[in-house]
Structure formats: C-alpha cells, structure tokens
C-alpha cells in the first residue's frame, strides 16, 4: 500500500532552504545584478562577466530544481496527490525542465553567439560603450551593412529571449511553490 511519509524536520528544512536560496538567487540575478552591471561597465565587459557567472548560476538553479523535485516527489506518492499537490509537483517539474534547457542549451548558444558578435563589433570599434543605448546608431549601421552580423544579432536575440523566458518560468514556478509552502505552514 502506498503511504505518504513524514519527511521530518531536517528534510523539511533542507527543502525550504534549497527552494528559497534558489528563488533568492534568481531574484537577485534577474532583477538586480544584470541591470546594475549593464549600467556600470562597458558592453563587452558585461558580456564577459555574464559568460563567466551564468554557467554557475544556471547549473545551481538546475541542481536546486532537481533537489526540490526529488524531495517533494519522495514524500508525495503520485497515487495520493491532492489537486494542489499535483499543481505543486508540476511546478517543480516545469522548473526542472526549464532550468535544464536554459543551462544545457539556450544559455551556451547565446554566449557563443555573443562572442562571435563581439569579434565583429571590435573590428568596428564597438563594445566599449557603457549601457545598452551607447552607440545605438553605430550598431544599427553595422546590422544594415554586414549581413553576417545581422544574422548573428537575430540568433542572439532569439536565444537570449528564450533563455530569459526559461529563467522567468523557473522564477515564477519557485515563487509559486514558496507561496504553497507558506500557506501550509501552521505558524511562523
């Protein structure tokens, strides 16, 4: 007979710490770090810093997503899931899937494409301006006169957009799971 187990205080604490640490890191990276950095350093420096930090960030989110799903699934047998528990385990799974796609496919392609763009931009003395609006006209002219750069830019924007959506999806799933957990807490 399938039975729902009591995870005990240690497992519950680990689960809450992993989920909240992941969500906090996602909030910081998504809403603070990138915006502060892009306004403070040259564009190519920003890309280089992102290329070094994001693989760690993406894989930490992936590991935290796996741990959260594994702990939750271990103590909530499929046969005994309530509708709200079904939603919660689905959110954990969606987060894991989005984190895996982000870490293993979309983010690496975005980074490789960005570095190819940097090579062309350096040839045209671009990339040292601070902020997204620096030399906007020069980037536009480069796109118009260089079809290879234009294609790279389109590829970069497509993969960067999908990568950002995966990140936001994980952020929303983890946030919703934290809300579910908070609503189930008997007291503070």
From Swiss-Prot:
Its main location: membrane. It comes from Xenopus tropicalis (Western clawed frog). Pfam families: DUF4149. It is found in: Membrane. Keywords: Membrane, Transmembrane, Transmembrane helix. One of its GO terms (cellular component) is membrane. Coiled coil: none annotated. It is a multi-pass membrane protein. This is Transmembrane protein 205. The gene is tmem205.
